[in-house]
């Protein structure tokens, strides 16, 4: 099954999408990667969904990526004696470590590390910013606040602290257990929530031990400030606009999104734009015009993937949501201005031989009637480099490793094909042209560009570029064996 678009679609699974028929229908509607949210569901639930995805993959003979999204250190208030209280603007309100049920004057905040980092003037945002508190004075186990934006506060509502880099590890004990479980299960990507510093990613990578690629979620102001350092140690990025829009002014999120996407593209690392993309489709079969424009904007920016959360996990119309996203992507990529927008934001990087080879491959493809760029890759790195160029022709990612094929399902423009391990260059050329023909990218009369590394099966050796005819009879006998 060949996609007719470059941008990928990530669909979150949940109660509305947990059976074989629905998951298969989501894939056939356009989902390329499935997200398993570790914040919801038991390990048994997650394992059951993982098993179904792999069954769909086997039945349709197409590599499918799986992304496990770790919960992260979510901060929450305690409980109230009456379950909820109304906070009035200007009133005093205290948060502290006492486990006593809350009332209209105080509630537990069971996170001593927060109090250690707070200073007068800091803000506490409750329930996605619907309630705002200003810290007036604080100590090691309390903070006396004034209510700047009132509202109803109830049990276990989330708390954000936008003004402070909190001394919290990005991985809670639950996250560590979930990470190990997900890696043992065989997921392809791990999304790390509430990253604040590069050390958070390094810690997760040390625990994953190469079993899954690490995707850093940018959803804290501290992560935006440390973005370049975080990007360097990550395999990919998710622009998680939900908490980002709570802790920062909402009008600042679009330019931040644009900067994060461009930075990831320049680094040749996949980037997902996520959160509330088609939010109204949780209840409605048709999205708003603004939501469609939001998805389109991310595609024009050159994001590798756009993501559905509750729309596909718990909404009434999960398949329609994926189909809508697919249709928007197809429409954008057919727009005559799309190419000029993508090309204008391309970052030229010529630091290595591999950089030069993939840039030359794109230029050759655009200057001639080349039908596709095929690249052999053990790790997926060459596929990332080719995708960074955002070529005008499809990318055929050839690898003998199913794990690499699944990870590249997230990469812009990449069509993953499992091949036999190659030892000789001529065999690689023949394998590439057969893949191009068999998957509908080219006919016998056409040509493709091939990139590879010799010796084969060695990471980071991209050093050959070949223009190859798709008619095997025309492949030169003087090609190196």
Where are the regions a protein language model picked out?
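Non-catalytic helical/linker scaffolds that mediate oligomerization, partner binding
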Residues: 1-481
